[in-house]
């Protein structure tokens, strides 16, 4: 984990040195994809199965809070111009020293500082009980065939497959919703872009509430009881598309976020538990990350296609609701839930 935070820091420094932003972000993304299995795998190894839902609830709360805090901090840094002539000085200094003139050097410095502190904190984590069974992280150990077999193995497991299916579907829909909410805030509510971002923050607040409730109300053996939350989320999407009043949009967005948080946390815990039993704690999270990111890419590509075709927002929201409804109904049927 410390090494991956150091790699993220390297990506930021590369951007400062004039490396193309796409390549720099690819380095940061590579580090993030390796960091997540270590983080969630550590949780799986650190707490007993009966506490896994609660641990995931607190982890989800902390992640969303960090996103909100980071977004707010970024806005403050971008809006802070410092003393008179500060921006021009930064641009001149960074051009001479780094070869890339920028007025945002103080923003990059804060990001580097945060990644550096995170790497130092991660370095203090003590090895868990599964340390002896871990494969060293090196390119020679990377095997697509082995990874694909692990992927199929997790999908074929009755409990692991359902939880992986639900989280994959959730993240694909959620990725589109991030952009759809901004567009809806502008077209339906008449808000500017910066105010539309507040609507996104309301969803995040709802996720925090839902994650905390899930950690308090559910245990691993009752994780299947949260599946109908997916149907509630599907019902809310087309309703939001027709809302034109901010006072009504606020509770709807928070309710949608809460439904998503309550659905995601127990499913994550169930997937981690089954994945650790079938594969290993870290490997199962890597499989989960692969499927979820593939879902995000696919859904965003489809969303871009609908925008290119000029499909109205209400129709896009309705299609999202239908995808979620048709996707969740097979696993939400009473007979199916009893079989889990």
PLM segments and residue spans:
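Helix-to-loop junctions at the C-terminal end of transmembrane segments
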Residues: 1, 78, 209-223, 307
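Substrate-agnostic recognition of the 12-TM MFS/MFS-like secondary transporter fold
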Residues: 1-7, 23-79, 170-178, 203, ...
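Structural signature of the two symmetry-related core transmembrane helices
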Residues: 1-13, 224-240, 318-321
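Transmembrane alpha-helix termini and helix-breaking/packing motifs in multi-pass membrane transporters
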Residues: 13-17, 69-111, 187-188, 297-317
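Helix-loop junctions on the cytosolic side of multi-pass membrane transporters
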Residues: 41, 45, 101-104, 108-138, ...
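A single, central transmembrane helix in multi-pass transporters
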Residues: 85-95, 99-109, 150-209, 243-249, ...
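Juxtamembrane intracellular "pre-TM" segments in multi-pass secondary transporters
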Residues: 125-166
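C-terminal transmembrane helical hairpin of 12-TM major facilitator-type secondary transporters
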Residues: 224-264
